[in-house]
Amino acid sequence: MKDKYLRETRMVDFSNPAIQKLIQNMKWKEMGEFERIKAIYNYVRDDVLFGYNIDDGISASKVLADGYGQYNTKGTLFMALLRACNIPCRVHGFTIDKRLQKGAMTGFVYRNAPKSIFHSWVEINFENQWYELEAFILDKTYIKKLQEQNSECTGAFCGYGVAVKDFRNLIIEFDRNNTYIQSEGINQDFGVYDCPDELLREHHQEISAFKAFAYRHIGRHLMNRNVRKIRER
């Protein structure tokens, strides 16, 4: 069973020299399994900043080179680092309501975005149990600034890349538990897949060629600017 959750793929390209160098420098393989998972999780969450890449189908090494990512792309990098360090993992596909992106998406970008946005999280097998990990998507600096800028919110929150029931008490640290940050926005479940390559072969963002071009060359840059503004306030 474990072999299929540890294999390398085009997207989960953990033999890439940059990924191998990172693993060596961080000394993750020298840690116990629990500490290794936590360290990789924290790295992907906080050192790879929240932002929008050119495409969901880019490789883990490209995400690392970009230095930023979102739910799908950061998940690909997370899986590559986990598998390279002998932690079995898989991907779970969904769509989410675009309302949770409002604020990161604004103006014509938000108005023209699909109502349902392709989404995924990573599931790890640790101590014979599967854990659902989603909260690596947003870096803690971004979350802290968002909480400061919405200090009046003490309950549910939806927007700026967040969809949760309790905005003040987020479950974003891994300690043998599931972690979530956008799960309250899920509106369709595609189930689990061995790797993102297989998930994307069956499901992907439904968008016209024109809108895809506009996203790559205009929309995502405006979205990244909005995210930076929040983080730097």
Give the location of each predicted region.
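Secondary-structure boundary elements
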Residues: 1-66
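His-Asp-centered catalytic microenvironments across diverse enzyme cores
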Residues: 7, 11-14, 96-233
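Glycine-centered secondary-structure boundary/capping sites
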Residues: 18, 22-27, 80, 145-146, ...
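Residue-level signal for well-ordered alpha-helical scaffold segments within enzymatic catalytic domains
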Residues: 42-43, 80, 84, 120, ...
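Active-site neighborhood of thiol-dependent amide/isopeptide-bond enzymes
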Residues: 52-117
